[in-house]
Amino acid sequence: MNHLTGLFGLPASTLVELLDLAAGYREGLNREPETFAPLLSNRRIALVFFENSTRTRFSFELAARHLGAGTLSFTAASSSVSKGETLSDTIRNLEAMKVDAFVLRHPSSGAADFVTSITNRPVINAGDGTHEHPTQALLDILTLRSYFGKIEGLKIMILGDILHSRVARSNILGLKTLGAEIAVCAPSTLLPGRIDQLGVQVFTNLDKALAWADAAIVLRLQLERATGGYIPSLEEYSAGYGLTDEKFDRLKRLMPVLHPGPINREIEISNMVADRIQPPGYSSSMLMEQVTNGVAVRMAVLHRLLAK
């Protein structure tokens, strides 16, 4: 593996290798004090972000530092991109500064694959358009594996704006490769055409989807969808597809809930569901475990691509 631009085409053995490596790093993150071998000392990683990010950018930066690497943080608004510089010129200039790898977030689908065609440095996709977000899917899968002890045979329901979600696509690819069953749940206007051809079950009723599932991955609803004709209103979306205590009370069994963040509270997920770490109740929020696992997964990816 020379790059990580997506989970499409990656064999189960590679995914398991990354997950096992990440699980070891997560144990290290939970120790006091944190101590890691400086495997990437004298390496320099360019964090090239053309879109805003909190969790992804900071966790890549922490992951690099834990492994002894330095980082260069790039944001489009404060760079020559604001003066018209192209993506390829940006990458070539950073490469001329002798950076060792690129972590790229970009609004255009396929941007990460394009960058692999103009550099021989490792490229890690931190989210490109509606295409993929592979490290988010890996941290979600690690969170689920840690909770259940396995992935094979699990029934995972992905809830929300499937149509525009790179997180959904990467999770479907990774989870199916590892043997999980996948369902998606959303209003029909937020489902891609021919989504069933990906081998997933489709629900438009949340109660039925919850009854089917072992775990739920909730997606962020981009609020402009309410004015773009995709949903009647935020209130109606929340009533039909928001995860609330009341919906879990009807289910009457425990279910872990994941969310990639940031959360639109009281729209896609209620405060009580988002903030509940342990029972009582029937939902168990895994949001903070996801954040910790995000650092561990990104350490594993950097290790796999850069350690000699």
From Swiss-Prot:
Keywords: Pyrimidine biosynthesis, Transferase. InterPro entries: Asp/Orn_carbamoyltranf_P-bd, Asp/Orn_carbamoylTrfase, Asp/Orn_carbamoylTrfase_sf, Asp_carbamoyltransf, Asp_carbamoyltransf_Asp/Orn-bd. Its EC number is 2.1.3.2. The keyword Iron does not apply. L-aspartate binds at K83, R166, R220. GO terms for cellular component: cytosol. It catalyses: carbamoyl phosphate + L-aspartate = N-carbamoyl-L-aspartate + phosphate + H(+). One of its GO terms (biological process) is 'de novo' pyrimidine nucleobase biosynthetic process. GO terms for molecular function: amino acid binding; aspartate carbamoyltransferase activity. It is an enzyme of class 2 (transferase). Pathway: Pyrimidine metabolism; UMP biosynthesis via de novo pathway; (S)-dihydroorotate from bicarbonate: step 2/3. Carbamoyl phosphate binds at R55, T56, R105, H133, Q136, G261, P262. SUPFAM superfamilies: Aspartate/ornithine carbamoyltransferase. The keyword Nuclease does not apply. Belongs to the aspartate/ornithine carbamoyltransferase superfamily. ATCase family. Catalyzes the condensation of carbamoyl phosphate and aspartate to form carbamoyl aspartate and inorganic phosphate, the committed step in the de novo pyrimidine nucleotide biosynthesis pathway. Heterododecamer (2C3:3R2) of six catalytic PyrB chains organized as two trimers (C3), and six regulatory PyrI chains organized as three dimers (R2). This is Aspartate carbamoyltransferase catalytic subunit.
